[in-house]
Amino acid sequence: MAVITPTETVSTTEVEIARTTLGASDTFAYTEGTTKYLVIDNVTAGSLTPNIDGDGATTAYFPGVGVVDLTGGYTLGSIAAGEIFILDLDHIKQYLQGTITLTGGDAAEAYILEV
């Protein structure tokens, strides 16, 4: 289990990005109010369908939709071999409560950009 460490991108010079090769189950931290982007680079030969699950996420109310069960986590769309997927973590903050686990991304490379 690897920890995906954010790379702070606020700089006047170049920034080296800390990439993590994903395993069966990886973790990362999220703090509401920060601007973080999760980037998954599918360097594998097949499609991946990652899932992000905060173990403290239960339900959330969304206007126009109602109460939504968050316990299964947030499943990303299929990421084809060679594609790069970027997710603004603020958009799924309700799923990011407690310990956050990323599964389904085996052998892909991931990093978090903090801007």
Question: What residues fall within each predicted segment?
Answer:
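Surface-exposed, low-hydrophobicity beta-strand/loop segments enriched in small/polar/acidic residues
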Residues: A2-V115
